[in-house]
């Protein structure tokens, strides 16, 4: 356990949070580069893309780590049985799915731009997959946290209480 939550909640939640911050920094940097320089020649053509990719990969890894830390033990009542006799917290499945959707959208975005040119706005289909996957991974982290509260001694407000303790 880390604090009052099981390790399969605390560790992946921290990794997902840090990874999303890295991806967000990359996204803001990428948008500013596109505003200044226009379309870049490929998916790995500017350094901001590496931050985005690293962040999205971290999100996917956090879901995989949550599954790996539970193994063959059923972690919560809402856990899902995997084909290899392992159990997965529902939140971990949501996080993995969101991370995978975002990572798949990255090369699709390059194909989209090669076919249709530069987007007029940020809200093209592949950008929605990228942003949506990252955003909904937060929902997966909340679900994972709620599952941990069910089996641990923590509360749903524990992260808020922790931050309040740091500020006070």
For the regions a language model picked out, list residue spans one by one:
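Membrane-interface interhelical loops and short amphipathic "cap" helices
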Residues: 28-50, 108-128
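N-terminal regions that are enriched for targeting/export leaders
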Residues: 1-40
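Residues within membrane-spanning alpha-helices of integral membrane proteins
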Residues: 16, 20, 49, 53-56, ...
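Transmembrane alpha-helix boundary signature
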Residues: 32-35, 62-79, 107-117, 146-147
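Membrane-embedded alpha-helical transmembrane segments of multi-pass integral membrane proteins
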Residues: 22-29, 55, 62, 101, ...
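Membrane helical hairpin/interfacial module
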Residues: 48-95
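Membrane-interface helix-loop-helix junctions at boundaries between adjacent transmembrane segments
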Residues: 80-94, 106-166
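Alpha-helical transmembrane segments
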Residues: 13-26, 95-103, 166-168
């Amino acid at each position: 356990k880390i604090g009052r939550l099981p390790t399969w909640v605390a560790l992946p939640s921290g990794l997902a949070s840090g990874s999303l911050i890295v991806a967000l920094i990359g996204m803001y940097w990428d948008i500013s580069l596109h505003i200044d320089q226009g379309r870049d020649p490929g998916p790995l053509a500017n350094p901001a893309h590496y931050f985005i990719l690293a962040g999205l990969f971290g999100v996917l890894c956090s879901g995989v780590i949550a599954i790996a830390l539970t193994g063959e033990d059923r972690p919560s009542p809402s856990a899902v049985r995997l084909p290899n006799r392992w159990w997965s917290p529902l939140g971990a499945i949501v996080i993995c799915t969101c991370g995978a959707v975002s990572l798949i959208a990255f090369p699709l975005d390059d194909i989209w731009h090669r076919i249709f040119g530069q987007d007029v706005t940020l809200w093209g289909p592949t950008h929605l997959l990228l942003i949506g996957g990252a955003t909904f991974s937060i929902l997966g982290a909340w679900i994972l946290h709620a599952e941990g509260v069910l089996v641990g001694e923590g509360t749903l407000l524990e992260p808020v209480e922790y931050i309040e303790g740091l500020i006070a």
